[in-house]
């Protein structure tokens, strides 16, 4: 192989080679980027401006992966206090970067996606809205249970593996959730509960899931087991509720499949209610074990407030809430508009949305179980003319058929809430081709200490 440097031959790198490199950038997943003799390497726990000795882990045709062996120069943006366990598991894959620089990184992710994918550089991307206290914010935890060193342990898997690293302080989870996980772990050890063995397909307890209402403080504990028959449930419940009076719901889920999915189909309420209750922007919500509910309540409120402000609605306006879930965004809009029409393909979520509307005395929000494309076609035939279509899709973004159907409704505005800048930029490009102009872009940090970024954008019909 001949180096780009004229006339100089270089040795092909192989696994376990150690080379000195300078980190020039961060990938969209927060890995350090190093360039060496035509190769691009991705290195965890490495920041721009740092100079490191890198051990080669894998080499592909033009790229590879490495790990830090030694640092020669550290970035001033490095957070030296972070526990490396949070990086190894991916719990906090940006925890080694100062929070101010995390917010800058996330703004850049949005800018880069808009420019590289949609060719947009003339619209201002606002500074990322961040948290005052960017730790211990998650209101939900899902932790695997495995045997480590002969005993039942809870924690997180090492990245790209199913090797459990025991953890007691999860860094970004509500501290009461951490306490309940640790108490349950210790209690089930005393009852000699067998943890799940993924290789042998043996054992009883697969996962512990905990939800906590940010404002209500109510807690739900879900024990995911491989079979219906379990341990001495009454004794376990008694001790948990005695230690944690805020626990108002204990549920068993049975998952007997060889799968990475956390939940199986069957749920059984062992104690208390089927749901917990919490509030967001003044509305109350009943939250089940399966409900999609934003894990960062404080920042979800800021996200929704941004979407409401961008939409700039009045009492005469009609809003279509596509991907309406359990109604959190749509019901937040309902107070300021004539009507909200929500559509969601998951029937259980639609029932939750309808119940949440009733719970809050909201009578101008209507939710249906359907595809958005079919629902919008039906509403158009019924003469419903939305001022705004609100979209909050999964990471894969919008389908072409959805984009076409939404444009056919002729809304003056489309407010797009995104959890993936790349698919957002792709969809914006398509909307621009169909007569909509990008007007506003606001990143919001719902997931501090991680590379994930949410964004609200406003598209206006030209």
Swiss-Prot record:
Family of the protein in this entry: Belongs to the class I-like SAM-binding methyltransferase superfamily. RNA M5U methyltransferase family.
Enzymatic class: transferase
InterPro entries given in the database record: MeTrfase_TrmA_AS (IPR030390), MeTrfase_TrmA_CS (IPR030391), NA-bd_OB-fold (IPR012340), SAM-dependent_MTases_sf (IPR029063), TRAM_dom (IPR002792), U5_MeTrfase_fam (IPR010280)
Name recorded for this polypeptide: Uncharacterized RNA methyltransferase SPy_1346/M5005_Spy1098
PANTHER family: RNA M5U METHYLTRANSFERASE, TRNA (URACIL(54)-C(5))-METHYLTRANSFERASE
Keyword presence, NADP: no
Domain of life according to the entry: Bacteria
């Amino acid at each position: 192989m001949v180096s780009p440097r004229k006339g100089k031959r270089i040795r092909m790198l192989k696994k376990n080679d150690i080379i000195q490199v300078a980190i020039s950038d961060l990938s969209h997943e927060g890995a350090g980027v190093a360039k060496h003799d035509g190769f691009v390497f991705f290195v965890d726990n490495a920041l721009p401006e740092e100079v490191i000795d890198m051990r080669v882990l894998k080499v592909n045709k033009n790229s590879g992966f490495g790990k830090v062996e030694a640092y020669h120069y550290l970035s001033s943006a490095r957070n030296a206090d972070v526990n490396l366990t949070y990086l190894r598991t991916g719990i906090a894959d940006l925890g080694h970067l100062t929070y101010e620089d995390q917010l800058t990184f996330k703004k850049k992710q949005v800018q880069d996606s808009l420019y590289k994918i949609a060719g947009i550089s003339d619209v201002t991307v606002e500074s990322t809205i961040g948290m005052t206290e960017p730790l211990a914010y998650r209101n939900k935890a899902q932790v695997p249970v495995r045997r480590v060193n002969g005993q039942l342990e809870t924690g997180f898997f090492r990245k790209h593996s199913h090797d459990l690293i025991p953890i007691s302080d999860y860094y970004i989870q509500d501290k009461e959730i951490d306490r309940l996980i640790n108490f349950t772990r210790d209690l089930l050890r005393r009852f000699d509960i067998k943890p799940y063995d993924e290789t042998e397909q043996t054992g009883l307890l697969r996962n512990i899931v905990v939800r906590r209402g940010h404002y209500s403080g109510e807690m739900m504990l879900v024990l995911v087991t491989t079979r219906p028959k379990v341990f001495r449930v009454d004794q376990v419940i008694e001790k948990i509720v005695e230690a944690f009076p805020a626990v108002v719901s204990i549920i068993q889920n049975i998952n007997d499949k060889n799968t990475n999915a956390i939940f199986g189909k069957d749920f059984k309420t062992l104690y208390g209610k089927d749901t917990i209750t919490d509030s967001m922007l003044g509305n109350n919500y009943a939250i089940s074990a399966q409900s999609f509910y934003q894990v960062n309540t404080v920042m979800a409120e800021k996200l929704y407030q941004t979407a409401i402000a961008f939409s700039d609605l009045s009492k005469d306006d009609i809003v279509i809430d596509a991907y309406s879930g359990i109604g959190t965004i749509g019901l937040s809009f309902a107070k300021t508009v004539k009507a909200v029409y929500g559509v969601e393909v998951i029937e259980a979520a639609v029932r939750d949305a309808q119940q949440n509307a009733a719970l809050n005395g909201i009578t101008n929000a209507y939710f249906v179980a359907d595809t958005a494309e079919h629902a919008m076609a039906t509403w158009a035939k019924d003469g419903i003319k939305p001022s705004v279509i609100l979209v909050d899709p999964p990471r894969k973004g919008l389908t072409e058929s959805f984009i076409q159907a939404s444009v056919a409704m002729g809304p003056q505005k489309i407010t797009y809430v995104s959890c993936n800048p790349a698919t957002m930029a792709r969809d914006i490009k398509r909307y621009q081709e169909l007569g909509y102009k990008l007007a506003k872009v606001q990143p919001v940090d719902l997931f501090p200490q991680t590379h994930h970024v949410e964004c609200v954008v406003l598209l206006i019909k030209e």
